[in-house]
Amino acid sequence: MTELKNDRYLRALLRQPVDVTPVWMMRQAGRYLPEYKATRAQAGDFMSLCKNAELACEVTLQPLRRYPLDAAILFSDILTIPDAMGLGLYFEAGEGPRFTAPVTCKADVDKLPIPDPEDELGYVMNAVRTIRRELKGEVPLIGFSGSPWTLATYMVEGGSSKAFTVIKKMMYADPQALHLLLDKLAKSVTLYLNAQIKAGAQSVMIFDTWGGVLTGRDYQQFSLYYMHKIVDGLLRENDGRRVPVTLFTKGGGQWLEAMAETGCDALGLDWTTDIADARRRVGHKVALQGNMDPSMLYAPPARIEDEVATILAGFGQGEGHVFNLGHGIHQDVPPEHAGAFVEAVHRLSAQYHS
């Protein structure tokens, strides 16, 4: 077993005792940091940054040099799998990710390959191995993937969407085609995450960014069902240590009980869910991650500290809480406000772990 100097994050996910509440931030390696912008400029474009193991490692480590974070998260993108399937990923200025060959029908789905994680996605595994080496056992490394539903939204819509009318048309008019796509994606995500674990990821997270746009019935059928399949197929132990799995559906606070039944170790909460209520509902089954509104980081540090105190009190005494934002950090947040947030979590949480 590789020695970890700080295993708070892994212990909290398994609802084991810790000295203080662990904290990390979604998108902690990102554009709010001037050093990230410099490395991104050096890479040339976003996907070149993802595909260069040394540069991906550098931006992964940047926030850890600034803040005493309790975990590192692989620097990558959720759209690596659709890109490896040959959909022609590119980034349009001001538009976000786009695909030159979106999925429009069952025939398109039939043609999609299931990518080999050590071949077409080998650059991700190289990044994982490089980051693990450079972390030198300081903190654990989180691997991740998008959920099948969330990946499918981009693949069918051809990019980002506000209304999701194209994929919902497929969902209601040709559900068989969508289920075939989701099944293929579930197999791809399972292989991809297991390869990340074998390469050195010590915990994995599934980001279901767009599950919250579905009705309850559709969420069960088109999103949660496939995440459950992935959880069932994941390696849960590696290098002599349990590998915790976190599910995060943005806008999914009403479905926590169903999510907790998947066999995952933890659930991510966005800021619209009350953490005290979430703990009452599912805290006996899973750990909880979250859940400060990312926009709170625009506030003065004293106000950030008040919000941290409120969320810690909401979760209350005992184990099973990883502090995080309710979604990714915004790109124009002052870096010192992020530092105040991390410091406040550690300082104010000790009283809950005595």
Curated annotation (Swiss-Prot):
Gene3D superfamilies in UniProt: 3.20.20.210
Any Gene Ontology CC annotation: cytosol
Location, primary (coarse class): cytoplasm
Subcellular location: Cytoplasm
SUPFAM superfamilies, per the entry: UROD/MetE-like (SSF51726)
GO biological process entries: protoporphyrinogen IX biosynthetic process from glutamate
Biological or metabolic pathway of the protein: Porphyrin-containing compound metabolism; protoporphyrin-IX biosynthesis; coproporphyrinogen-III from 5-aminolevulinate: step 4/4
InterPro entries linked to this entry: UROD/MetE-like_sf (IPR038071), Uroporphyrinogen_deCO2ase_HemE (IPR006361), Uroporphyrinogen_deCOase (IPR000257)
PROSITE patterns documented for this protein: UROD_1 (PS00906), UROD_2 (PS00907)
Site location (Transition state stabilizer): 77
Keyword vocabulary terms for this entry: Cytoplasm, Decarboxylase, Lyase, Porphyrin biosynthesis
CDD domains, per database record: URO-D (cd00717)
EC number: 4.1.1.37
GO-annotated molecular function: uroporphyrinogen decarboxylase activity
Catalytic activity of the protein: uroporphyrinogen III + 4 H(+) = coproporphyrinogen III + 4 CO2
Role, per record: Catalyzes the decarboxylation of four acetate groups of uroporphyrinogen-III to yield coproporphyrinogen-III.
Subunit structure as annotated in this protein's UniProt entry: Homodimer.
HAMAP family to which the protein is assigned, alphabetical: URO_D (MF_00218)
Family: Belongs to the uroporphyrinogen decarboxylase family.
Name of protein: Uroporphyrinogen decarboxylase
Name of the coding gene: hemE
